[in-house]
Structures are given as C-alpha cells and as structure tokens.
C-alpha cells in the first residue's frame, strides 16, 4: 500500500504551464534553470542523468574592413556561406541564449552585428551544434565542429573562430518529467521502508518545473526540486 500511495501522488501531478512550454524546445545547458528563472537553488539527491542531445560551440565572425558597408557585406556573406556548408559538415546552426532557434538563410537577418573590441570592426556570434550519443563522443563532436569552422573560407577580411568554451543542449527537458518522477518514487519507497512502520514520507514540490545542470563532459542532470519529509504516522 505504501508504494501504491506514493505512485498515485506522483501520477496526479499535472505538468505546469511553464513546463509545457519546454516539452519540445531545445535549451542550452550552461548551468541550471535556476540562473535563468530564479527558482530555488536546492538540488535534490535524486534526478535523471542522461546524455545531452548536442555539443554546442559559440562561434564568431569578425570583420575589420575600414569601409562600413563593405565590412558588413563581408561578414554577412561569410555567415551565409557558413549556413550553406553546415549540412554537408553534419552540424546544425542556431542562435539564442536560452531557448535555441535554428539559424537558416530564411532568418539570417535576425542575427545582429555588434561592435567588436577595435575601431572599424564588427562581429556576429552564433552557435554550431554537433549531435551526441551513439558512437559520437564529446571529443568527436568537438573535432567535427573544428573541421566545420576550418571549412568555411574567409570573405575579404572577415574570419570565423570559436567563441568561448563549448556547452551542451537538451531537447524537451520537461518531457522527462515521468522518468524523473519514477526515480523519486523509487527513492521515496526505499526511504519509507528504512524508517519503519512508525514513520511515513511526504513529497513536496512535485509541481515545480523540471530543472537541469551539467553533470559531465557529455551528460546532463534533469531534476525536480522536490523535498522529502519524514513524518510520524498518526
């Protein structure tokens, strides 16, 4: 009966509206959702550890041609070339700080040019993604992205380079809520058994959105910031 009661509680939890927004969207795992949406920073011991979907590397195209119009044409031309070469290189392009949007020739103008750190220079930053999983390790994904960057020729004085460290992304983090809840139920049942007949466990916070953090070179930890409370039976 104890196991059944916990399972029924977990099954009764509906997916929050905010969680439904992330059922299928791809997010960047730079840290946890805490930093993005100001949720509680309490990370429970139980979560779902799984491979990330993509290795993500920010790249920058810089140009310093003196004439502004020519400089911008060169940067834009190289960006368009980068988009055209992505599929053949087995990578995908995207933009966004949190939720990722595919970068294509149809929306390339949505990427703004910004002033670089020198006079008469500008840059554009976007993301290159390589799939993880199967036979594709993190190291292999890094090498794939590096080869892609080398394959895109410069245009005028525009050049493309890596921009900072790589990170990970995961598609639809909130779609893993049932698997996370199952792990919580297993741990809660085990805890209840250890407490003896005089005590029960209560689970609080299961209505919170799924959160995430990086768990290893190519893995993420998905979790719900629940709270397990041991209480005496009446």
Report residues per predicted region.
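Sec-dependent signal peptide recognition
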Residues: 2-7
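Short, linear, compositionally biased motifs with a strong N-terminal bias
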Residues: 10-11
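N-terminal signal peptide c-region/cleavage motif recognized by signal peptidases
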Residues: 14-16
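Short, charged, surface-exposed interaction patches
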Residues: 20-187, 193-234
